[in-house]
């Protein structure tokens, strides 16, 4: 460890860029997306964290290697989301990435309604999985559309209208 960084650079060998390297560097796969479970290597299991948003809801998510336990605002998944549809929405990223039951989830969710919170948690989990191991999980999550923030929000009410677009009844005479 007595070598300085400049001495290490002087000892390295420089190889020219060949046509064979160009083919590898610019190769495009005919099928770049990978379906769930089709990745070349198993997904890496490591801790990760991310934030997800949907409508007015914000979810701060931490995933830790474990046995698949859920803590959402201090409650279990079944207690926080009693509706099976919401439970399925929330667990979908793990199934898509092929790591069901490999992580414990700790989440703080605030704002919005139940469906918005489920969507925010789903996005947060997908982003956390992507942060942990992008090579294994990103293609499947991206293909399923789970890494995209749903930008749809409620439209504001306009002056002179009853709601965002509903106008008062119009009388011709």
Curated annotation (Swiss-Prot):
Keyword Cell inner membrane: no
PROSITE patterns for this protein: RIBOSOMAL_S9 (PS00360)
Chain spans, region Disordered: 1-26, 135-173
CC terms in the record's Gene Ontology section: cytoplasm; small ribosomal subunit
Biased composition (Basic residues): 154-173
Biased composition (Polar residues): 1-15
GO MF: RNA binding; structural constituent of ribosome
Record SUPFAM superfamilies: Ribosomal protein S5 domain 2-like (SSF54211)
UniProt keyword list: Ribonucleoprotein, Ribosomal protein
InterPro entries on file: Ribosomal_Su5_D2-typ_SF (IPR020568), Ribosomal_uS9 (IPR000754), Ribosomal_uS9_bac/plastid (IPR023035), Ribosomal_uS9_CS (IPR020574), Ribsml_uS5_D2-typ_fold_subgr (IPR014721)
Protein name (record): Small ribosomal subunit protein uS9
Source lineage: Bacteria, Bacillati, Actinomycetota, Actinomycetes, Propionibacteriales
């Amino acid at each position: 460890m007595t070598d300085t960084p400049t001495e290490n650079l002087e000892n390295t060998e420089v190889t020219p860029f060949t046509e064979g390297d160009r083919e590898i560097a610019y190769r495009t796969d005919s099928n770049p997306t990978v379906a769930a479970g089709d990745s070349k290597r198993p997904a890496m299991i490591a801790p990760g964290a991310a934030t997800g948003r949907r409508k007015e809801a914000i979810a701060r998510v931490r995933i830790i290697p474990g046995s698949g336990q859920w803590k959402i605002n201090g409650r279990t998944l079944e207690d926080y989301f009693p509706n099976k549809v919401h439970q399925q929405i929330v667990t979908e990223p793990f199934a898509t990435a092929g790591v069901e039951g490999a992580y414990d989830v700790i989440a703080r969710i605030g704002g919005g309604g139940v469906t918005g919170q489920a969507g925010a948690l789903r996005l947060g989990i997908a982003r956390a999985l992507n942060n942990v191991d992008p090579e294994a999980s990103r293609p499947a999550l991206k293909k399923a559309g789970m890494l995209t923030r749903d930008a749809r929000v409620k439209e504001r009410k306009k002056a002179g209208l009853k709601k965002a677009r509903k106008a008062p009844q119009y009388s011709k005479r």
